[in-house]
Amino acid sequence: MEYLVDMRLADSARSTTPAEGVTFIEQFIFPTLELCQKLTEEQRILAGGTLSGAIGLAFIIRADAAKEIDEIVAGLPVWPRMVTSVTPLTTWSDRAAILRPGLERLRAQTSGAGR
């Protein structure tokens, strides 16, 4: 299954001094970017990148279990400083297959109402 991961810097994690900013970039941002690149090369991250104009990441991962999601997301150095949401994704064909029976029921109700 595929998941959309959205990570945004928590307000409490914002640097307040230039020295904190340097430390944050060196110890959290660069290592996270390097690890995301590696995970992309390993095809654990399927697509994604940094958010333009914001301090955040958005990417799609494939995982068979919640444990895999936790390993990837919590393994990112920047994770403790981020507000993170993980959304399960359904494929286009799976969604269409789920909707077909409901559509047929609606059609049956519509044709029955016109009698």
Please place each PLM-identified region on the residue numbering.
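Conserved, structured core segments of small domains
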Residues: 1-115
